[in-house]
């Protein structure tokens, strides 16, 4: 399991390397769906921190705060560190490409679909800021098709 910072840096670096830098909003959604997909593939969590239900979908607050200075603009940071195990890189890279190609607002719409973990927790705003349990995330079926 990796810290949210480690995974965020990996995504930012990878997206930059393919000429498709991401915004904070897009980063958050890619991280969320990677957590879902990683659990499905490996039966273990990719990211140790919890996601919270915010207006525009699942968010890890510490990551949001790290990149909030960019607003809706693309993140320009680059990182030298890379602690992601080689055994997972092909899986992560393929899924980051897949998710990034959808664009941030499609990813937001996917997290907002009726019945998703975000939808259940956010509850029309009554659950704004509440933690989306890892048990709910493990059951997310958004990306099955």
Regions found by a protein language model. Give the residues of each.
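Domain-edge interaction signal
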Residues: 1-145
